[in-house]
Amino acid sequence: MRPEHIARTARQAEELGYGELWFSEDCFFAGAFAGIAAALGATEQLPVGLGVASAVTRHPALLAMECATLSRLYPGRFWPGIGLGVPFWLQQMGLKPRSPLRAVRECTTSLRRLLGGEELTEQGLFAFDAVQLTHLPEEELPIYLGMVGPKGLELAGEVADGTVLSVLAGVEYVRWARERI
């Protein structure tokens, strides 16, 4: 969807009684956080989810800052999701994580800790030196993981509050995935 159509489409979705609206962060299209802010600002009650931002393209501290800001602006209406990202797009940017699942795990746990008010100083796949959010969310945010394979789905069941499945997922895949989460 073109960015200039987001607010109108979100309003229409709310007027038609949709229960939620989800944005993906597909590289080289429209930025998800700006689109989500436009959708939230154009609606009164419609929850909006991020399904998903890449754990590799955005540092967890920046993700936490964006998530906390949206949560404070629109309490109870923003649901963040994290995933690896499309491998081809990551390769286009020269990003090749040695352990994709470790990247998603570390990003998710760091995001949760930062949103909870912790100050992080640690070295791992992501480095932190006395990083702490200034403006914390006023409520605990549910964190979703967008995963596909069995190990990723297992990770989602371990560290996330919910799982985002592909828009292309069929009934059989959903059954298969639920057994692994």
In which residue ranges do the predicted regions lie?
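Generic recognition of short, well-ordered alpha-helical segments
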Residues: 4-8, 34, 61-65, 158, ...
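Active-site mouth loops of central-metabolism enzymes
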Residues: 1-4, 53-60, 137-148
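Short glycine-biased active-site loop of nucleotidyltransferases that positions the nucleotide triphosphate
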Residues: 40-41, 61, 134-135
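Internal, glycine-rich beta/alpha segment that forms the wall or movable "lid"
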Residues: 64-181
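A cross-domain feature marking catalytic cores of carbohydrate-active enzymes
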Residues: 1, 25, 50-54, 82-84, ...
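Generic structural signal for helix capping and beta-alpha/helix-loop junctions
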Residues: 30-31, 58, 87-90
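Glycine-rich "substrate-gating" loop/helix at the edge of Rossmann-like oxidoreductase active sites
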Residues: 26-27, 53-58, 96-97
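N-terminal beta1-alpha1-beta2 module of alpha/beta enzyme domains
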Residues: 1-50, 141
